Design a protein with these regions (language model features):
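Active-site-proximal loop/helix segment associated with metal-binding centers of metalloenzymes
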Residues: 90-98, 121-209
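A general structural motif
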Residues: 1, 31-33, 63, 129-131, ...
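Short, solvent-exposed loop/turn segments at secondary-structure junctions
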Residues: 10-11, 43-45, 73-75, 139-143, ...
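Binuclear metal-dependent phosphoesterase catalytic core
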Residues: 22, 81, 216-221, 232-268
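Core catalytic region of metal-dependent phosphoesterases/phosphodiesterases
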Residues: 6, 12-128, 204, 210-212, ...
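Beta-strand-turn-beta hairpins that frame and shape the catalytic cleft
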Residues: 1-4, 114-136, 182, 240-248
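Divalent metal-coordination and catalytic microenvironments
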Residues: 8, 36, 41, 71, ...
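Cap/insert and terminal regions of metallo-dependent hydrolase folds
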Residues: 43-44, 54-56, 67, 181-230
Length: 268
């Protein structure tokens, strides 16, 4: 059993294909059940037409069960599933996910913050399974919202968390005693925003930072081992001044077990 994570795909299957081709001759890779966490803006529910289905079919060629964290450039799975018999709820990783019947290997995390139990082999000699407790926080603000609206491109009005969803998250982390192993999100706490990557044509005074500020509060409250996010289209392994691992991903793939156990991050 192996669990990996990757950042934004934006409808491109090639990073997944290339990762698989780099490792499909390895014995350990081939014998393991493989899970791939997509950290938002995957492009699976972007066009809401046959183009999405084509992308899902391409991803389904590869031997992964996908766990999808919602970003900002995609529709909420719960909106698509509403009154749609082709979608159903499932129990997965100790939580609830949405699944489209045609693509049972693609599991969509809830559109609100939720905890999941990610299984891993903690003792390979005796094949003993343990779990990581993971807090999943979806959503982000689209800095190119006005451009998208002007050009007729997709923009999703409920891309960010609602205040009610944030309140539920705060209650959930209190119930969890403010502790988990992983935090998985699309955007990141405000203190970790890569300002050097901000688009120069965007007036930052017009950007809604409420999601990043909320995540900053979560970061202050939570005792965690590793936080993974995407959104900014760059790989970055942040300094660990407090001992916590903070990793930003784009097309890079990482192994959660390696990241959890070791001080360095190996890009696969």
């Amino acid at each position: 059993m192996k669990t990996y994570a990757i950042g934004d795909l934006h409808g491109r299957f090639q990073p997944v294909r290339d990762f698989h081709l780099r490792h499909n001759t390895e014995k350990e890779y081939n014998k393991a059940d493989k899970f791939l966490i997509l950290l938002g803006d995957s492009g699976l529910n972007y066009y809401l037409d046959s183009r999405d289905k084509t992308f899902k079919k391409k991803l389904s060629k590869y031997p992964f069960t996908y766990f999808v964290v919602r970003g900002n450039h995609e529709e909420r799975a719960s909106n698509i599933a509403r009154n749609n018999p082709d979608w159903q709820f499932e129990n997965f990783w100790g939580g609830i996910v949405l699944v489209e019947k045609e693509f049972p290997n693609i599991k969509y995390a809830m559109d609100y913050p939720a905890f999941y139990n990610i299984p891993y082999i903690g003792n390979h000699e005796h094949d003993l399974t343990y779990i990581w407790r993971a807090l999943v926080i979806p959503g982000a603000y689209s800095v190119d919202k006005d451009y998208r609206l002007a050009m007729g491109y997709s923009w999703f009005k409920d891309e960010q968390l609602t205040e009610e969803e944030k309140d539920v998250c705060l209650k959930d982390i209190e119930d969890a005693h403010y502790k988990c192993d992983f935090i998985l999100s699309h955007t990141c706490p405000c203190v970790f925003e890569p300002t050097d990557l901000f688009l120069p044509m965007i007036d930052q005074s017009t950007v809604d930072k409420s999601m990043e500020q909320f995540l900053g509060y979560i970061e202050f409250l939570m005792d965690y081992d590793c936080w993974l996010w995407g959104h900014y289209h760059k790989f970055r392994d942040y300094p660990r001044t407090d001992g916590k691992k903070k990793i930003m991903l784009m097309h890079e793939v990482i192994d959660l077990e390696q990241v959890y156990k070791e001080d360095t991050v190996e890009v696969l």
